[in-house]
């Protein structure tokens, strides 16, 4: 068995993220037990931020 750069390519076999039970996205980290998308396993509230949505300013810029 050789060591060094050639053997580092063998470290990408498994998958870190599986399907989340709460949001259904493939973002649940297996070792951390936390969903990167919705925050399941870390908090009971859905993970959301203000920068996810465009800000509404005035009458001409309505966002649905």
From Swiss-Prot:
It holds the Pfam family Ribosomal_L37e. The keyword Zinc-finger applies. GO terms for biological process: translation. Transmembrane segments: none annotated. Zn(2+) binds at residues 20, 23, 35, 38. Keywords: Metal-binding, Ribonucleoprotein, Ribosomal protein, RNA-binding, rRNA-binding, Zinc, Zinc-finger. Its cofactor is Zn(2+). InterPro entries: Ribosomal_eL37 (IPR001569), Ribosomal_eL37/eL43 (IPR011331), Ribosomal_eL37_CS (IPR018267), Ribosomal_zn-bd (IPR011332). Binds 1 zinc ion per subunit. It comes from the Archaea. Gene3D superfamilies: 2.20.25.30. Binds to the 23S rRNA. Belongs to the eukaryotic ribosomal protein eL37 family. This is Large ribosomal subunit protein eL37. It comes from Methanococcus maripaludis (strain C6 / ATCC BAA-1332). The lineage of its organism: Archaea, Methanobacteriati, Methanobacteriota, Methanomada group, Methanococci. The gene is rpl37e.
